[in-house]
Amino acid sequence: MAKIQKTVKSTTSSTAKKAGQPPGTLIYTGKKTTEKVIVTIYNYTSDTFEEQEITQLNDLSKFKNNTSNTWINISGLHETALIEKIGTCFNLDAMLLEDVLNTNHRPKVDFFEDHLFFTLKMIGIHTNQKDIDYEQVS
């Protein structure tokens, strides 16, 4: 019979990073990494679709006041200064950005006047491993 192994993860490190900080303080609670952060914009309407990797933050401003739908995909949240600049560009609340950087956040949905915010877990299985992997989607 196959043996099931359970991995126990410590959650004290991520909460300890935020302890004593005022609400809205931008602290990344995920795994430390040095990988490059990649920002990709998906801009779409019922008739069009545009995908663009952003290399300069100034390129984000053209998506701010458009009438189409815009999805900002950020692969890598460890550069909090970059996340803060993106939040400033789109007038996102610091509490919302804090939720994005908290990779242990429970699923939720917040409705704002001009945008929708949700956070949830995306689950995947690596075919070459027997582990279940998950990442946060916000």
Sequence positions of predicted segments:
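Peripheral, non-transmembrane regulatory/ligand-interaction domains of membrane transport proteins
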Residues: 1-138
